[in-house]
Amino acid sequence: MRTRVAELAVEAVMVVFAVLVAFAVDEWREERQLRDFADRARAAVEAEIAANVEEFEATAAALDSVQALLGEAVRNDDPSLLGGSIAFSLPEPSSAAWRASQGSVAAPYLDYGWVIRVSRAYEVSETYARIAERAIDDMSSVIGTGATIETMQPIYGRLVILSDMHGQVRDRFQALLAGEPPTSP
């Protein structure tokens, strides 16, 4: 009887051990899957940032040109320098991958320092978007009314700020891709 009890005890210990090993393996597998998911989320955010950089680079020259044209018209007090119309396009940076990564189960597995740097860059991008929206509103408010220096001065001022922010956002995104810390807080 004692040997039977001892055998049952050994079997019970083995079963408990097997269950514990199974739990540990399952936990390890789940942890690995979450880390892999975090790596994919980070790669998606970095691809999104690279696409945003391309948009900012593609639209910088046109924005600078319009800003220079408006500046010349304002400095010379001559709205006729503007010609018939002012046309340019602004980037439409995406934050979809960034937002999705923040709401996913991968979020706790992303490097915290990287998350802070990316968050700061997207905050600057959001500020840029607000300034761009106001500049577009300002410009659209004078369409068909005949441009005057008085109406163009605030638009020019906003475009100066917008152009500066354009470069800041691009530079922050580029620094993220290069793995560099931001140059300013």
Language model: regions and residue ranges:
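N-terminal positive-inside, membrane-proximal cytosolic segments immediately preceding the first
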Residues: M1-V16, W28-E30
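Conserved non-transmembrane functional hotspots
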Residues: A58-A61, A68-L82, A87
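N-terminal alpha-helical signal peptides/signal-anchor transmembrane segments
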Residues: R42-Q67
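N-terminal soluble domains immediately following signal/targeting peptides that reside
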Residues: T59-V66, L70, S125, M139-V142
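Soluble extracytoplasmic domains of inner/organellar membrane proteins
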Residues: L82-P185
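Transmembrane signal-anchor/signal-peptide helices with a preference for the extracytoplasmic
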Residues: V19-A41
